[in-house]
Amino acid sequence: MSKMRLIVAGAGGRMGRALVRAIADSDGAELAGALEAPGSELIGKDAGVLAGLPANGIKLSGDLWTMSAEADGILDFTVPAATIANVAIAAERGIAHIIGTTGLSASDDAVIKSVTKRAIVVQSGNMSLGVNLLSALVKQVAKSLDAGFDIEILEMHHKHKVDAPSGTALMLGRAAAEGRGVVLDQHSARGRDGITGERRSGDIGFASLRGGTAAGDHSVIFAGPSERLVLSHQAEDRMIFAHGALKAALWAHGKPPGYYTMSDVLGLKDLF
């Protein structure tokens, strides 16, 4: 069976380099292209060398249309504007689009979902097995505990992360909201500062920390009368996200058009 040919978007970034390494270690995939923003100083550089590997002959380019002609999928952990630009091309080419980009707006998500009648999209705020299991647990716990338990989500990432709360924190927040039977946007408390007044009943709170090289720490706190339940996950290496994204791509290869998440990839939808 031939290997799945994958493009890495943002191949010169930290996550992009991790994806290149994951593909190099895979028996089921090979690197078909390395995408960077047009005008980047990295254009023309060898993707393997940038990832700390031997040269592989794949040069970074800003031309997704050309490199996608012989590809089967694209792994996209970039920025919202780049991901939205990539969505149209991936759909036109009929290749699987694995999206781990965070900071997307509701309108961005609507654009992504609009192509899924004719394209394959797997999207998740976090591609790791552990976090997706955590999300399933959070939903079940939120459903099981009554409103006397307040829900707070604490996350920490490295100092270079540009969006907050993290995509993973929001994913966990949505899981908690779903368990409670509410809409997160209507029950979200962020950035408390100064005299805020008492905590509003039913809110799901978020707090974000930034510093050092933390790959991603997340805790969901259920604070009730005289007791607290804390569900946590610590990412020690961003390679867990790269391997998860690669697993998603291989799973999506040959699937019918549609919108999928890591719960589909990992078979978690019927866990509880």
Curated annotation (Swiss-Prot):
Instruction: Name the InterPro entries for this protein.
Output: DapB_C (IPR022663), DapB_N (IPR000846), DapB_N_CS (IPR022664), DHDPR_bac (IPR023940), NAD(P)-bd_dom_sf (IPR036291)
Q: Which GO terms describe its biological process?
A: diaminopimelate biosynthetic process; lysine biosynthetic process via diaminopimelate
Q: Where in the cell is it found?
A: Cytoplasm
Question: Among its keywords, does the record have NAD?
Answer: yes
| Cellular compartments per GO CC | cytosol
Domain of life here?
Answer: Bacteria
- Which terms does the record give in the GO molecular function aspect? 4-hydroxy-tetrahydrodipicolinate reductase; NAD binding; NADP binding; oxidoreductase activity, acting on CH or CH2 groups, NAD or NADP as acceptor
* Pathway it works in: Amino-acid biosynthesis; L-lysine biosynthesis via DAP pathway; (S)-tetrahydrodipicolinate from L-aspartate: step 4/4
Where's the active site on this chain?
H157 (proton donor/acceptor), K161 (proton donor)
- The positions annotated for binding NAD(+) are G10, A11, G12, G13, R14, M15, E36, G100, T101, T102, S124, G125, N126, M127
Q: Which UniProt keywords apply?
A: Amino-acid biosynthesis, Cytoplasm, Diaminopimelate biosynthesis, Lysine biosynthesis, NAD, NADP, Oxidoreductase
Binding residues for (S)-2,3,4,5-tetrahydrodipicolinate: H158, G167, T168
- TM helices/strands, residue ranges: none
As its record notes, the protein acts as a catalyst of: (S)-2,3,4,5-tetrahydrodipicolinate + NAD(+) + H2O = (2S,4S)-4-hydroxy-2,3,4,5-tetrahydrodipicolinate + NADH + H(+); (S)-2,3,4,5-tetrahydrodipicolinate + NADP(+) + H2O = (2S,4S)-4-hydroxy-2,3,4,5-tetrahydrodipicolinate + NADPH + H(+)
Q: What is its EC number?
A: 1.17.1.8
Biological function: Catalyzes the conversion of 4-hydroxy-tetrahydrodipicolinate (HTPA) to tetrahydrodipicolinate.
Protein family: Belongs to the DapB family.
Which named protein is this?
Answer: 4-hydroxy-tetrahydrodipicolinate reductase
Taxonomy of origin reads:
Bacteria, Pseudomonadati, Pseudomonadota, Alphaproteobacteria, Hyphomicrobiales
Gene for this protein? Answer: dapB
